């Protein structure tokens, strides 16, 4: 763990001491080396699945894929932000990259923590850099409104979690993840244990987000700069799923009855957010709402607590992280050229930027879960385990899949096909940097087809 954390912390002096000419090159190079070093986590040798580096930090098959995804995303975020930040003064550029690095540090500590309180502290700490990135470097003035939504939704959800964790610490005397799976849920009064169960999961359901507490997500996504959108879609939403999977182990047998309304809400959310996507005119908003739908499927897979559901959830989290991040990067390349997020104003891009259209096509297919891609593997496992739990879920999940395919194709056709608008006369050509950025998103998705057991989590 330290072989990643120490180089990550050493990125701060790199950023603040390197000369202006080499700032972006050195920070991208060093973060890419860290990302490649993080791949060494993917070999497991111990019998328990935990490979512990010290008392406070350890990795297991559930956290490793998410840790690698976090490290992989930092160089991509820095790559994506380069042209967006070039007009800014040098020290602001340095501050921006420093915020991204601090965010990665908190995320690595959150996914690697063995104490739940440490996980909680890091879970909350990720809020701060994200909030500064959205409210300082966002595009429109609504970014302050989006930041307020983001802050209050997240804090209101996670305060009950803190109370629940302190109650548990008081009862058990420990909050270590190694021992908590063997403990009993708290024996409280009639309503006490139900409230305790809800408090344990509410913070994560808001973070995922579950349909109904999702209103902060489209706002935050639309207003955030490109790096903010990427890390939000790819990793911060996955903190919710990861936290739920960690807490689920100790909430039995309460979850058996109490999870019903949440599963129904998650499945209903897939259809509702899909229908919203079909009506969207705003490019980033469409991708943000599609994230809510996918994470609803993940929430359902985790809440029914079967091995297939858990495995499908973690596969879908990883695959969705890469695919939606790629879509946000593509939306950003279009925004940097046309200065508009409205899809009608940026049609017919296939005529001008044909290679970009190829990337749009592949990313849209990854989003709609094309057969060999891991997105489909995750969705199928969750849908199958839900079907085993209740036949009726097939209607909702099947309809959700159909709508997902519809809006993904709608997204592709609206941006790439059709007549060229008259106001698009001279567009700047694409850069190698942008192609590299998208390739580095899509290559892992394609390679994971060949070795999916890297992200099967606990249950293989």
Curated annotation (Swiss-Prot):
Places the protein is found:
Mitochondrion membrane
Q: Does the keyword Transmembrane apply?
A: yes
Regarding the membrane, this protein is recorded as:
Multi-pass membrane protein
Q: Which GO terms describe its cellular component?
A: mitochondrial membrane
Q: Which GO terms describe its molecular function?
A: NADH dehydrogenase (ubiquinone) activity; ubiquinone binding
Q: Does the keyword Transmembrane helix apply?
A: yes
Question: Which InterPro entries does this entry report, sorted A to Z?
Answer: NADH4_N, NADH_Q_OxRdtase_chainM/4, NADH_UbQ_OxRdtase, ND/Mrp_TM
Q: Which reaction does it catalyse?
A: a ubiquinone + NADH + 5 H(+)(in) = a ubiquinol + NAD(+) + 4 H(+)(out)
Q: What top-level branch of life does the organism fall under? A: Eukaryota
In the Enzyme Commission scheme, what number(s) does this protein have?
Answer: 7.1.1.2
Q: Which top class of enzyme applies to this chain?
A: translocase
Write the record's keywords in alphabetical order, separated by commas. Electron transport, Membrane, Mitochondrion, NAD, Respiratory chain, Translocase, Transmembrane, Transmembrane helix, Transport, Ubiquinone
Q: Could you say which protein family the record assigns here?
A: Belongs to the complex I subunit 4 family.
* Role description: Core subunit of the mitochondrial membrane respiratory chain NADH dehydrogenase (Complex I) that is believed to belong to the minimal assembly required for catalysis. Complex I functions in the transfer of electrons from NADH to the respiratory chain. The immediate electron acceptor for the enzyme is believed to be ubiquinone.
- In Swiss-Prot or TrEMBL terms, this protein is called NADH-ubiquinone oxidoreductase chain 4
Q: What is the lineage of its organism?
A: Eukaryota, Metazoa, Chordata, Craniata, Vertebrata
Q: Which gene encodes it?
A: MT-ND4
């Amino acid at each position: 763990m330290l072989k990643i954390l120490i180089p990550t912390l050493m990125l701060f002096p790199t950023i603040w001491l390197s000369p202006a000419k080499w700032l972006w090159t050195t920070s991208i190079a060093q973060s890419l080396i860290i990302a490649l070093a993080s791949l060494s986590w993917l070999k497991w040798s111990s019998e328990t699945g935990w490979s512990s580096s010290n008392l406070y930090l350890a990795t297991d098959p559930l956290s490793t894929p998410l840790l690698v995804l976090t490290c992989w995303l930092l160089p991509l975020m820095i790559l994506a932000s380069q042209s967006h930040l070039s007009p800014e003064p040098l020290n602001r550029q340095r501050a921006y990259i420093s915020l991204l690095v601090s965010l990665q540090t908190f995320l690595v500590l959150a996914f690697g923590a063995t104490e739940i309180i440490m996980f909680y502290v890091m879970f909350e700490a990720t809020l701060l850099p994200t909030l500064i990135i959205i409210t300082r470097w966002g595009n429109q003035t609504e970014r302050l409104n989006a930041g307020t939504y983001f802050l209050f939704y997240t804090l209101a959800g996670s305060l009950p979690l803190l109370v629940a964790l302190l109650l548990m610490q008081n009862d058990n005397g420990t909050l270590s993840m190694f021992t908590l799976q063997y403990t009993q849920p708290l024996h409280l009064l009639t309503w006490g244990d139900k409230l305790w169960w809800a408090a344990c999961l509410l913070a994560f359901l808001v973070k995922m987000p579950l349909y109904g507490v999702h209103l902060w997500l489209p706002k935050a996504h639309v207003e955030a700069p490109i790096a903010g959108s990427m890390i939000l879609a790819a990793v911060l939403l996955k903190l919710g799923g990861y936290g739920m999977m960690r807490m689920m182990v100790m909430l039995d047998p309460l979850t058996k009855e109490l999870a019903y309304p949440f599963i129904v809400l998650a499945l209903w959310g897939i259809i509702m957010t899909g229908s919203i996507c079909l009506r969207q005119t705003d490019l980033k908003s469409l991708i943000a709402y599609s994230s809510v739908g996918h994470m609803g499927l993940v929430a359902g897979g985790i809440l029914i607590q079967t091995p297939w559901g858990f495995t499908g959830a973690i596969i879908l989290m990883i695959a969705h992280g890469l695919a939606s991040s790629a879509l946000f990067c593509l939306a950003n390349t279009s925004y940097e050229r046309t200065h508009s997020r409205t899809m009608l104003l940026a049609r017919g891009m296939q005529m001008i930027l044909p290679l970009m259209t190829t990337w749009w096509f592949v990313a849209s297919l990854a989003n709609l879960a094309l057969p060999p891609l891991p997105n489909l593997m995750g969705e199928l496992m969750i849908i199958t385990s839900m079907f085993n739990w209740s036949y009726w879920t097939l209607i909702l999940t099947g309809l959700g899949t159909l709508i997902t395919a519809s809006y993904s194709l709608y997204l592709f056709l609206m941006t790439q096909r059709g007549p060229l608008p008259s106001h698009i006369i001279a567009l700047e050509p694409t850069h190698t940097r942008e192609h590299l950025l998208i390739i580095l998103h899509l290559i892992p998705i394609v390679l994971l087809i060949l070795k999916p057991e890297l992200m099967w989590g606990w249950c293989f």
